[in-house]
């Protein structure tokens, strides 16, 4: 999906004790991603949906540089053979941004991620909640009790623990803040899609 769906996060918060190791492994994996024909099963990254959307996504790269960020991988266009007219771009990783920057708090809908370190549970919760959006997030930890505690403190409609995009149509789907109102899924869908009618009669 090239980061173009609502459930794709555009920032990763990394505990400072593993920050450098995680960053280096993330860069290595991102640079290995195969960009090309989406009908090829070995392809991992396809084209963006349109030229206008690519311009919008790339504008966030320019904004990140203006905000003091550093592009640590990505940015160059990829033009796979036979698909030169596509809206290609390599996934971008940005570090060095303030957690309050626009690039770190807005929805980008493209293959861009900002990375940030944190040193405490309260700090990561504060950073996670420092956005106008709240649809979904993912927590990765070997300490499930801590992960559950943090999940309950994050102002988001959905939190995955040690997984991502794991959907069950029987459970509620929806966000908070600017990420929407109400829930779909299971019995919640009946309320969401129902249109109750009120008929009021005055009797003499």
Where are these regions (language model features)?
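ALDH superfamily catalytic-core signature
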Residues: 1-98, 161
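Conserved C-terminal structural/oligomerization subdomain of aldehyde/semialdehyde dehydrogenase
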Residues: 34, 81-204
